[in-house]
Amino acid sequence: MKFNIVSPVALSCLFFLFLTGTLAQNAGSIVTRELFEQMLSFRNNDACPAKGFYTYDAFIAAANSFPGFGTAGDDTARKKEIAAFFGQTSHETNGGSAGTFTGGYCFVKQIEQSDRYYGRGPIQLTHQSNYERAGQGIGVGQELVNNPDLVATDPIISFKTAIWFWMTEQDNKPSCHNVIIGQWTPSPKDTAANRVPGYGVITNIINGQFECGMGPNTAAESRIGFYRRYCGMLNVPTGENLDCNNQKNFAQG
């Protein structure tokens, strides 16, 4: 019988990767089925239009298409990313009572549907340009432009569009992913606009034109409330700079 001997250097590298979390398998190593159900228990309430749509298996299948999602950095960084992602998307799809932060993932479609490319899915993907870029990003080409309702009828595609948005830089905006794992360095223009690392700038990325630079507001507080709840469930600190109350939105340069 032949034995393969692993060198001390290789063992040291593996140990380092283990300590830093680089070998984390996928988002499922943090978000177990049980935790998913606890975080999003309201989603299958009879009052929710999304009842039965957002499943754990669909989330994991989508997450596994993005190897960096929920796997970058140490244990705290990975958990904070999961808390931040679900904090933002729970607000976007909230159907619960104000101030409870338990009603996430109740909706799939935007209630007020002004055009064909209205908000759908966990991130409430809007605008034809985003449907086109998301389709390219998740490997379905023009399918989302031709049939945008796929984001509201195929749960894996729905989650994929949300994670694609989360992982992707757009225009002058960093990716939400890079912000939450501490890999974003503000430019001089960002600094002048009070855009600083933290959960608040993620709100700015997603909906800054309507929620940032105008002082405290209900929507921004909802996003923070969900994030705090999930950080508590994952036993990680929220970090600083949770709001974007004094930040210029990215559209202002």
Curated annotation (Swiss-Prot):
Report the catalytic activity.
Random endo-hydrolysis of N-acetyl-beta-D-glucosaminide (1->4)-beta-linkages in chitin and chitodextrins
Q: What class of enzyme is it?
A: hydrolase
Q: What induces it?
A: By fungal infection.
Q: Which domain of life is it from?
A: Eukaryota
**To which protein family does this belong?**
Belongs to the glycosyl hydrolase 19 family. Chitinase class II subfamily.
| Active site per UniProt | E92 (proton donor)
Annotated GO biological processes are: cell wall macromolecule catabolic process; chitin catabolic process; defense response to fungus; polysaccharide catabolic process
In terms of PANTHER family, this protein maps to: ACIDIC 26 KDA ENDOCHITINASE (PTHR22595:SF159), CHITINASE-RELATED (PTHR22595)
State what protein this is by name.
Acidic 26 kDa endochitinase
**Organism this protein belongs to:** Solanum lycopersicum
**Entry keyword annotation includes Oxidoreductase:** no
EC no. given is 3.2.1.14
What Gene Ontology terms describe where this protein resides (cellular component)?
Answer: extracellular region
By its UniProt entry, which InterPro entries does this protein fall under? Answer: Glyco_hydro_19 (IPR016283), Glyco_hydro_19_cat (IPR000726), Lysozyme-like_dom_sf (IPR023346)
Please give the Gene Ontology molecular function terms for this protein.
Answer: chitinase activity; endochitinase activity
Which function does this protein serve?
Defense against chitin-containing fungal pathogens.
Location of this chain's protein in the cell: Secreted, Extracellular space
Print the keywords alphabetically: Carbohydrate metabolism, Chitin degradation, Disulfide bond, Glycosidase, Hydrolase, Pathogenesis-related protein, Plant defense, Polysaccharide degradation, Secreted, Signal
Q: What cystine pairs are annotated?
A: C212-C244
Q: Please state the span of the N-terminal signal peptide per the UniProt entry.
A: 1-24
Coiled-coil stretches? none
